[in-house]
Amino acid sequence: MGSPKALLEFRGETFLDRLTRVFSQFCSPIVVVVGAQADDIRSGVKRPERAIFAENANYQLGQLSSMQCGLRTMPEKIEGVLFTLVDHPNVQASTIAALLEQPRPLLAIPRYQGRRGHPIYFGAGLIGEFLSIPPDSQAKAVIARHLDETRWVDVDDPGILDDVDDAAAYRRLIETA
């Protein structure tokens, strides 16, 4: 695609600027984990004050290692975590609001037309579990252990499914904007 996903443009903003703007309406701090091309991403963000950047030196181990890096950067006393991937830039603010409705469950996962997506919410009680599994494994292992404690949040937001993994997916995203 020619540049880091975080710096791809969507509706006049980079993916990362859009996500930090939307998420900052609901939570603080916003922790952004960078790995490959970290300097390019930091310098390409238009509103860096909205985020705390954490650099994952082990990003090549996969997404869980980046999640763990971000969790280690969080303040000690938090209620929970909203977690998303930078290649899901089209999530609506209303979806985040729905995930954060009280009382908050251990896990909240959005669904659109029966398909689950991002972001997810998890309570602080799960942070230790995510940190305890090998960084080259998958977060799904922790989520699977707690499906009976999960609130499934049905939303009218196809953006939770938008996963921009290649140039074709990016074109589809831009065409729907």
Predicted regions and their residues:
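A conserved catalytic-core signature of glycosyltransferases
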Residues: 116-117, 138
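Conserved alpha/beta core of the MobA/IspD/sugar-nucleotide pyrophosphorylase nucleotidyltransferase superfamily
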Residues: 134-177
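Nucleotide and nucleotide-moiety/phosphate-recognizing core
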Residues: 1-116, 124, 129, 146-155
